[in-house]
UniProtKB/Swiss-Prot annotation:
NCBIfam families: tatAE. Part of the twin-arginine translocation (Tat) system that transports large folded proteins containing a characteristic twin-arginine motif in their signal peptide across membranes. TatA could form the protein-conducting channel of the Tat system. GO terms for molecular function: protein transmembrane transporter activity. GO terms for biological process: protein transport by the Tat complex. Belongs to the TatA/E family. It comes from Roseiflexus sp. (strain RS-1). One of its GO terms (cellular component) is TAT protein transport complex. Keywords: Cell membrane, Membrane, Protein transport, Translocation, Transmembrane, Transmembrane helix, Transport. This is Sec-independent protein translocase protein TatA. Residues 45-67 are annotated as: Disordered. It is a single-pass membrane protein. It comes from the Bacteria.
Length: 67
C-alpha cells in the first residue's frame, strides 16, 4: 500500500474543503469533539459509582430453577 506524503494529504484536504465547504467541516468536527467529550465523561462517571457502591448482597443464596 502506498504511503501518503505531505503533498498528497494537502491536495486531499483542499479537495475536501472544496466539496463540503469550511463551515460544514467545522460543524462536523465540533459535533465529533462534543461526542467524544460526552463519551469520556460517561465512561469516567461509570467508574466512580462502582468503587463507592454499597456492598453486594450475599451470594450464598440458593437459586431456584424450574426443570
Amino acid at each position: 500500500m502506498p504511503q501518503l506524503g505531505m503533498g498528497e494529504l494537502l491536495i486531499i484536504l483542499i479537495i475536501v474543503l472544496l466539496l463540503f465547504g469550511a463551515s460544514r467541516i467545522t460543524g462536523v468536527a465540533s459535533a465529533l469533539g462534543g461526542s467524544i467529550k460526552a463519551f469520556r465523561k460517561a465512561v469516567r462517571d461509570d467508574d466512580v459509582p462502582a468503587s463507592k457502591s454499597e456492598p453486594a448482597e450475599s451470594t450464598d443464596k440458593k437459586v431456584e430453577t424450574n426443570v
